[in-house]
Every structure is written in C-alpha cells, then in structure tokens.
Curated annotation (Swiss-Prot):
A Pfam family that the UniProt record links to this protein: Yos9_DD
Gene Ontology, cellular component aspect: endoplasmic reticulum lumen; endoplasmic reticulum membrane
Stated name of the protein: Protein OS-9 homolog
InterPro entries with a match to the protein in the record: Man6P_isomerase_rcpt-bd_dom_sf, MRH_dom, OS-9-like, Yos9_DD
Species per Swiss-Prot/TrEMBL record: Kluyveromyces lactis (strain ATCC 8585 / CBS 2359 / DSM 70799 / NBRC 1267 / NRRL Y-1140 / WM37)
Oligomeric and partner information: Interacts with missfolded ER lumenal proteins.
Glycosylated position list: 47, 71, 142, 147, 389
Membrane topology: Peripheral membrane protein
Gene: YOS9
Disulfide bond residue pairs: 174-208, 189-220
Main location: endoplasmic reticulum
Keyword flag DNA-binding: no
Length: 457
C-alpha cells in the first residue's frame, strides 16, 4: 500500500497497456458535430424534406442545445443488400482472407488462453487442427475449395455485424457422435484495434461441431464489413443553442477535439499541440436522490471513482504518450500530469499518473494549480524508457530490471465494455449511438469531433 500526504487524494491504478492503433469502423468513428447560428439552423429544420430525411434530438435531457442528424438508413439497407448479393464483394473478401492466412500455417491460442491451440494451414487444402498442451491433435475440418467462393458466404451476427463464413468438413471421427468433425470459421472485422495480428475465440456449439471466430483488422478496410466506410465524412450533425448564446464550453471545442471516454469524462486533444496541452474535462453525474451516496462525495472523490472505471479505455485510446508523441510501451517509467477542467474550462484540479521502477502504479489528485506553471506542454513531468536504456550500454541512467507483476499483461484486453450509465458525456454518447442504431448500425462507437463556427466581426 502506498501512502501520500493527507492533502492528496490517492487511489490504486490497474495499468493496461494498449496495442497499436489503426483505422477501425467500430471504434472511435469520427462524426462532425458543428454548432451553427440560428439562421442556418432554421434553414434546415424549416425544410420539410430534410426533416423527413433526418431527426431532431437534444444531447441530453434538459439541454438547451438542439441537434439535427440526417437519416441514411435506406442507404445502409441498400448497401447490405448489395453486399449479400454481390459476387464481387465475396471474391474481394475471400482474397483478403487468403492473403492473410497463406502461405504459412498460423498457430494461435484463444483469448483467454486455454488448454488448446489451433493451427490453420492453407496448402493444397485448408485445415484446422486442434492441438493439446501435451501434443495430442484433432483435425476439426478441411476444404479444398478455399481459393474459390464455394465454401464461403456473408452472414450477419445477432448484433447486425457482417462477417464472412467458411465451413470446413471431413475432420477426424468424433468419439461421441461417430461422425466427422466440422468447423465454421467466422472472419470478422474487430470492434476495436487489436494488440496482435489475430484474435481467436472458439466455441463447441454441438458435440464435435466447432465455431472459430477469427478477428482480422485488415477486413475493416473492406466496405463489405463496414457499410458506412467512405460515407461518414458526408454525415454531419449540426446543433444550435436557443437564443444564439453559446456556452463557454464551445471555446474549448474550438481549440480541442473531444473524445467521449465514459462516466462524464472527455479527453481533450489540442488542435495546436504547440500552444495547448492535453487535458481532461469532467462533468460529475448528479445524485439520483437525496439518499444516494454520491450526494455526500466531493467532486474529487466522484472523479476518482469515475476515472478508475474508465482507466482501461483511457490507456487504450493512446491519449497518454511519451514526450516525443510515441505510444507508451512496457518498461516505460513516467509521471504524467494533466489539468482537469469543468464544462466552462475552469480548472477543477490536477491528475497525476505515475508508473515507477518498483512496478507501482500511483494516481494522485491535488489542487495545487501552481504545478501548471512548470508542466511541459507534452504533460510528462519525467519519462524514462527502460527499453531504450537496456539497449544502450553506455547510458548512465540505466534502470535495474524490476518485476512488473503488478502491471497487467499488455495483451490482456482488446475490447473494453462499460456498463455504466450516467453523466452528461455518457448521455451525449448514448444519444449519438442511438442515432446510429436508427440508421441500422448498432455496434458503432462514437468519437465527437467538435467544430464551432466563430462569429465574424
């Protein structure tokens, strides 16, 4: 247990390192959220045709901001029909899969790791072999048609996501059914960026009938797996505040792009990194009633709870970076500090995140605003990369090797879900995701890129 002075609020951190970031239609999908003046907004909502093609909504209950979003459900529907009926789209997807899997056999374990590993080979035939820890093997299925489209078809999951299905039959005989084993491979564009080339999940849906769900990031580049690919740039949301009186928060969004994290927390990335540093914006959820424990908590205490719950997602967003703008890697030791502001841009407090050489992850919230005067623009109070030190024999700052047992494996989590509901940021995110569901795309994640039209003098 780590103790800091009583003037500081301290909490424990579970530190998760993120893998590479890449374009992914299911995570951090950009939407242009533009605030306009009254005249431009009325030109939209007074247009009957546009109203029939879209919807009006408020970012959260009680908000005096009204937003319009055009509805493209018919375009999505037509795209899905084209995908399922297009031989060209099927050939394109099959070719992509074969380019990834061939020519060398691919051996992988499931996530989470199990007793079995799985080997997919693509030679004269495509085979899937199940291999046990002590070397026992079972042929789950094979196909000599993997270079054609005979054994493939597009399908849709229960959540509406398109995937490519391939069925392999004639595996070794099952001891229970006395029939050949068979396996279906589902090739899927992952919801979030992966920290490894492949992600495998396996289920035995019936005795000796298997389902392999293989997540391949490269599939996200194909429009067959992403019906909004190439069209999101044309899909904008416009908003207007009644009385043309804009909130001071909009000045923040003139200078920063904002990503909704969770629990009322925004990640603010400066549009001019030479002028502004990264910071967090926080809106504490209101208590549900006078009896709730939230009512008795300070803003700092409520932030700590919300921040801990959102920490995995924060690390996965690559928001915390080295002084040179590179992703944090295992072995990096640092103290990262950032201001936390409210919706009007007023400083609430500072948040410190430290990972030290004793494998201790420490978080601290304090109200010493003077620390901002000496804070580097890149937010790192200090930074030392053990990876660099270990390869530099002449370095005088080489750090001793330490156990990282308190730091979770960098490959521990690919997809992070949060059941929490509440707070302005979460409500805004929910509304935008509801809009996505209305246009037939239920699994999308939303990143809000704020653009404000400045008044002309």
């Amino acid at each position: 247990m780590i103790f800091l002075p009583v003037t500081s609020v301290v909490f424990a951190i579970s530190w998760i390192y993120s893998g590479v970031s890449a374009f992914n239609p299911y995570s951090s999908t950009p939407y242009s959220l533009k605030y306009v003046d009254e005249q431009e907004f009325l030109s939209v909502i007074d247009n009957e045709t546009l109203l029939q093609e879209g919807r009006l909504f408020r970012p959260y209950e009680g908000s005096d901001v009204l937003c319009y979003q055009r509805n493209t459900s018919s375009l999505i529907q037509h795209h899905e029909e084209d995908t399922f009926n297009s031989e060209g789209a099927l050939i394109e997807a099959v070719n992509m899969v074969n380019a990834i899997l061939a020519p060398n056999p691919i051996e992988m374990n499931t996530v989470p790791i199990s007793y079995w590993t799985y080997i997919i080979s693509s030679g004269e035939t495509r085979t899937v072999v199940q291999k046990g820890y002590f070397g026992e093997t079972y042929l789950l299925g094979n196909s000599s048609n993997y270079n054609s489209t005979i054994d493939y078809h597009f399908a849709k999951s229960k959540t509406g996501r398109v995937y490519l299905s391939e069925t392999l039959v004639d595996g070794c005989t099952c001891d229970l059914t006395h029939k050949p084993r068979e396996v279906e491979i589902q090739y899927i564009c992952p919801k979030r960026p992966l920290s490894r080339p492949f992600h495998l999940e396996v289920r035995e849906i019936q005795s000796c009938k298997y389902q392999l769900r293989l997540f391949l990031p490269q599939l996200c580049e194909l429009s067959s797996f992403n019906p909004l690919l190439g069209q999101l740039s044309e899909h904008n949301i416009i908003c207007h505040r009644s009385g043309s009186k804009l909130s001071p928060a909009l000045d923040i969004f003139n200078r920063y792009s904002a990503t909704v994290l969770d629990h009322g927390i925004y990640l603010l990335k400066p549009k001019n990194s030479a002028k502004d540093r990264r910071q967090l914006m926080y809106h504490a959820a209101e208590p549900l009633d006078s009896q709730t424990t939230l009512f008795e908590l300070t803003v700092e205490e409520r932030f700590i709870g919300d921040f801990i719950s959102s920490l995995k997602k924060l690390i996965g967003s690559d928001f915390i970076q080295s002084p040179t703008g590179k992703s944090i890697k295992p072995g990096d030791l640092f103290l990262w500090r950032a201001p936390v502001v409210d919706e009007t841009g007023n400083l609430l407090f500072l948040i410190d995140l430290e990972l030290n050489s004793a494998s201790e992850a420490i978080g601290k919230v304090n109200n010493d605003a003077s620390l901002l005067n000496e804070l580097p623009i890149h937010n790192m109070v200090y930074f030392d990369s053990m990876t660099v030190n270990q390869t530099d024999e002449t370095s005088s700052n080489s750090l001793p090797e330490k156990s990282t047992g308190l730091v979770p494996d960098i490959f521990a989590t690919d997809e992070i879900e949060s059941p929490y509901k509440g707070g302005t940021a979460q409500e805004l995110k929910d509304k935008l995701m509801e809009a996505f569901r209305d246009i037939g795309y239920p699994d999308i994640e939303v990143e809000i890129l704020e653009e404000v039209v400045e008044e002309q003098n």
